[in-house]
């Protein structure tokens, strides 16, 4: 078994320490070991009133990044050592932005303003500005729903920057592979990864067996239809013959051709739907967004 900095006994000892010194309700505490791969601290704190965080020494900007994400009013309960004993301290994240973690230990982060609902279909203003033109939040919600995201699912997103970010937030236990062919779009995606404090996103510049061979095997792939779509599908099917696809296109001709393309890869009965979103403006005019086609299908059936 892989050596762990925090095993079950040490986790239980820290839980006991905090329950003895605070009014911690174990029923509502989220346990997060960020010494393990791909653990996202900021989304966890945003979504839970109490997060017991286990971390190794270092992380010089951990509190600054939390503050920068709007979590400055959260309370951190901690001690100065690496053992669950001794004097307990409390401070606001906003007062800790100039310090890091001085010992491998547990700390309790309290967020009374934690949201009680899943952040699903985020407002486009939440994302970093840059070269990317983000899909509307309502349409993104449908795409994410079609992807059937759950904890631990590995996801590949091709040219869908905001989809990759929301998927990473929703799927904190899974690996997200984000493919961006354009260097400016990769930079914007990197800005978003840093802004949201995500550790489970790997950014690559194209899809082939070499770029994918060291990465997690994706369970589902979201693609924006392009000239390279069939090559992308072929590559992903070699990696996972049972992969699920969610494909986005504004082109009716592409949508109409998808049954034939899917049949070429042995994929039967793709579902093809069109989504239309209209908004009534303050001037009582109708603002209709572009109406994409979504194609969903699963290989190996």
Model-derived features with residue positions:
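S-adenosyl-L-methionine
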Residues: 179-220
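Conserved SAM-binding loop of SAM-dependent methyltransferases across substrates and taxa
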Residues: 161-173
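C-terminal substrate-binding/active-site "lid" region of AdoMet-derived donor-dependent transferases
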Residues: 233, 237-293
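Short beta-strand element of Class I
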Residues: 173-179, 245
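A contiguous loop/helix-start segment that scaffolds small-molecule binding in enzyme catalytic cores
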Residues: 48-130
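Core SAM-dependent methyltransferase catalytic element
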Residues: 106-113, 282-301
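Conserved class I S-adenosyl-L-methionine
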Residues: 152-161
């Amino acid at each position: 078994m892989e050596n762990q900095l925090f095993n079950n006994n040490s986790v239980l000892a820290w839980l006991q320490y905090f329950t003895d010194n605070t009014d911690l309700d174990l029923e509502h505490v989220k346990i997060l070991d960020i010494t393990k791969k791909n653990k996202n601290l900021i989304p966890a704190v945003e979504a839970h009133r109490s997060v017991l965080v286990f971390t190794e020494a270092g992380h010089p900007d951990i509190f600054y990044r939390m503050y920068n994400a709007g979590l400055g009013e959260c309370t951190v309960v901690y001690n100065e050592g690496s053992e669950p004993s001794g004097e307990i301290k409390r401070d606001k994240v906003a007062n800790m932005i100039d310090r890091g973690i001085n010992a491998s230990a547990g700390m309790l982060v309290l967020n009374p303003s934690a949201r009680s609902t899943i952040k699903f279909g985020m407002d486009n203003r939440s994302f970093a500005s840059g070269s990317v033109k983000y899909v509307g939040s309502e349409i993104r919600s449908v795409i994410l729903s079609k992807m059937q995201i759950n904890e631990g699912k590995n996801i590949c997103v091709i040219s869908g920057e905001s989809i990759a970010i929301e998927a990473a937030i929703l799927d904190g236990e899974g690996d997200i592979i984000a493919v961006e062919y354009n260097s400016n779009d990769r930079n914007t995606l990197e800005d978003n990864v840093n802004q949201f404090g995500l550790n489970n996103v790997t950014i690559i510049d194209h899809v082939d067996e070499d770029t994918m061979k060291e990465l997690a095997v994706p369970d589902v792939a979201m693609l924006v239809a392009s000239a390279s779509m069939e090559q992308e599908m072929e590559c992903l099917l070699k990696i996972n013959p049972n992969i699920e696809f969610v494909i986005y296109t504004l082109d009716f001709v592409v949508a109409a051709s998808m049954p034939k393309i899917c049949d070429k890869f042995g994929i039967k009965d793709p579902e093809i739907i069109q989504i239309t979103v209209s908004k009534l403006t303050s001037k009582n005019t109708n603002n209709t967004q572009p109406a994409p086609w979504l194609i969903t299908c699963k290989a190996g059936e």
